[in-house]
């Protein structure tokens, strides 16, 4: 029985590897391998594929092609792209700009799937739980998407819902990342010093934690308690009666995105003081609270 399971696992891994190879070739991303000397030993992965011989060229920029490939490959790769987008100091400008679109511009899953996830979590449809519920997402990311709603008691809330079947998708792709890390570790002396296997293992632990929205709700509630007497930050309230492993419901707060300088100035916000407050908040979380929000965009 165990032999059959291992065989199926290997077949599944091979199938996924071929899908990744096909996607990278389709978007002409094999050029990234050619441009990075440390990865030259892995070029054979592309040269052996018939997909390389018959592909059509595209006029899209390399940044756009990379972003589209990550979106096609699924949530784990989108998450990786999001992580890269927060380090524009390490990336060419054109790539950094495109990857930044992954922060909140990932295609949403359908309204029908949203209703199914709510029914599965609560045992009843959305309109029996909320006074109002918009089944069309207003924001969508790699792991989950957000919906506007109103509780029966009148409070405006944000409903965050995990992508369907994301656990299975993440598990499959983690197997691939671990395999790739082992390949890099074995075939590139230059990249081996970066400890790719350990990096992927840490990344795996981080992503799996993000899949538990009850854990996220608990962290948010703790941050709220840490700042409950502050006049420079407002942390949304968590509505625990509505929180599940795959669903988080929190207070909706109206505001201006911190990167919208024009609108902030129009609202009379002191930009310099805002920056000072942001630094103060972050360092207070890190050095005093030992619990910080690591996704402050």
Question: Residue locations for each model-derived region?
Answer:
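Conserved beta3 strand of the Hanks-type protein kinase catalytic N-lobe
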Residues: 149-150, 296
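Short acidic-glycine loop/turn motifs at beta-strand connectors
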Residues: 152-154, 254
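Glycine-rich ATP phosphate-binding loop
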Residues: 148, 155-163
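Conserved actuator
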Residues: 137-143, 150-152, 222
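N-terminal accessory/targeting segments that precede structured cores
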Residues: 2-145, 168-196
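Residues on conserved beta-strands of the protein kinase catalytic domain
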Residues: 143, 155, 245-246
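ATP-dependent phospho-/nucleotidyl transfer catalytic cores
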Residues: 93, 100-107, 119, 171-172, ...
